[in-house]
Structure formats: C-alpha cells, structure tokens
Amino acid sequence: PALIPWHVASVQAHIESLVASAEHVRFLWSPHAHMITVDRASRTDERRTPTQTSRIAPPLIKALLFASRFHASLPAPVSRAAFALTHARAPPVPRNELDTPGGLRPVRTDTAISVRVDDAPRVFNFDCLCEQYTTEYAVPFEYTGAALVAIRAWLQEEHARPDGERIHFPIEVRFVDADGIWLSPSYGRRTCYIGLVQYRPYRWPVRYRRLFARFEALMRQFDGRPHWAKTHTAYRPELLTL
C-alpha cells in the first residue's frame, strides 16, 4: 500500500511528546506490517498483575521466519502475521481515554492496549525468540525524526527491488539520557538507540551483512555511535572521532 508521507519536524515533535509521557519509553517498529508498538513504563505502587503468554505464537513465528528465508516476497506477510499473533485486536469503537487502565494517557484511543504491572527485571527482560544477528546505533536525540524518516525511505527502496534486502521485525527504538561515561554511546548527549535484528531460526544462516552495512552507512550520516556489544564495523580511527 501507498505510505503516508512522514515529515521530519512532525515526527520529531511526536517523538518528543511520546518520550515525555513516561519514565521509560521505547517503540517497536514493524516496517513490513506498517505497525508500531509503543512500550511505556513508569514506577507504580500498584499490585503485580498476572501475565498471559501464548505457547503457540513463538514456535509458529519461528517456523514462519524460517519459511521467509526462501523467497523475497515472504518477509512482509510473515511480519504482518507475527504482529497479529502477538497483539490484541483494536477495539470496535474508540475507548474513553480517561478509562484507560494503568494511569498513562493513551497515544491513541482506537488501537489495542495492554497493561502489565511487575518487578522491573521481569518487565525489561524479554525472550529474544531465537538466535539472531543484531546491530544498534546511537544517534543524538534531536536527529531521531530525521533518522527514522531516512530509514523508512531506504527500506522502501529495498522493498521495491526484487533483490533488495528484507528486514526482520521489529526495529527497536529506545531513548537514553546523556551520561558522563567516556566509552558510552550516550556520552555527553541525549540519545536515541535504533536497533535492527535478523533472526536465525533453527540456527540456519540468514542474510544480514549487506543490510547491516547499509544501515551503518546511514547512521553515520546522523553522527551515530555503535553499540559495542552488537555487530558494527567501526574501528579505532573512526572511534577516535566519535
């Protein structure tokens, strides 16, 4: 489908409003599904809520990811299927934002919402599903909107070509305050981390080198710094400039 144009200024304004809405904010962007999951967390004195996890979705998604290795047309429907398997359906009519559970004002009233109260380690740690290749870059917070618009345009170009790169899901976008740690990607500046992942279902290889190289080249245009624990090609001469 044709995509609604994104404008850098409006994207940045939405990001700034979103980040200010809770103590911890990240979102998971599924480009092929044209969907975004907003994940917001704040400290609370509420009691823990029971969590419900699907035993069917993880192995089914893994099998679909494996199948998507065999044809360039498959990652998009697999991404949409995975999103449907892991998210509740939107309400038939918009909800009253004052009745939203959890105390956080919803970003939208016509989308699905879920609320969880638990200890921090249980909230922030999650199952990565299967082995994966991953890369992540940290860009200055004020460049977030421009970087996301550029990534979207790049992925559109890739998807339009039969031999273009196909990205798995989701792209994780998270935010960190500036710190004073010399080797930290957030040293001296408020930061947006943008991370890509390519899954290896059943430990089978998957294409990732060219995709990651193009992503790195794009992030360098926004003064990006690599996450040390993930795939990157920045060596000493470049690191000295960061």
Regions found by a protein language model. Give the residues of each.
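Noncatalytic alpha-helical scaffold of FAD-dependent oxidoreductases
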Residues: 1-242
